[in-house]
């Protein structure tokens, strides 16, 4: 059985539980995906399948050949598989392969926030708001020592580019699936903004 699926983040909403409490959920339009390549231990050194998702406007000849006539896919991703012998090129993967209450890992690209200061990026407290201070409210303060060590240590928290990086959130719970609309309702938040491509894998697989 294939252990993952590719999808697109639709947005967030909420559903009400039996006790009346509102539960925030993320809607993911997952699949349908098509198996475009099967990788075996003998030929590739490991076992996995490559899935295709979404329709591409423009596609290179190399990718077109790799898709082998099953469609012109916008996204190609590899996922693990339990039994490689049970999978063949052209198989379709849908949300029906996931069950309510199942745990998943969601990977995507986080929203970019540009060049951010230390208060936003690293949650610094900032300087004093009074007692004669000026222009210190969101300043980082001291960033190192003097002659010794005579440099700034690697990894020092400073202002810089924030977001727009690969993020994986583990152990999320699938609350509900909708096979007709290809929707997964996932408890909590998932990386990225609207229409972000999300790779969903079953936890521990």
From Swiss-Prot:
GO molecular function ontology, one term from the record = structural constituent of ribosome
Pfam assignment, any one: Ribosomal_L3
One GO term of the biological process aspect: translation
User: Looking at the record, which segments are called Disordered?
Assistant: 126-150
Per UniProt, the keywords (alphabetical) are: Ribonucleoprotein, Ribosomal protein, RNA-binding, rRNA-binding
Concerning PANTHER family, the annotation shows: 50S RIBOSOMAL PROTEIN L3, LARGE RIBOSOMAL SUBUNIT PROTEIN UL3C
Query: What protein family is recorded?
Result: Belongs to the universal ribosomal protein uL3 family.
Question: Sorted alphabetically, which NCBIfam families does this protein's record hold?
Answer: L3_bact (TIGR03625)
According to the record's subunit comment, the protein's assembly and interactions are: Part of the 50S ribosomal subunit. Forms a cluster with proteins L14 and L19.
Stated role: One of the primary rRNA binding proteins, it binds directly near the 3'-end of the 23S rRNA, where it nucleates assembly of the 50S subunit.
Q: What is this protein called?
A: Large ribosomal subunit protein uL3
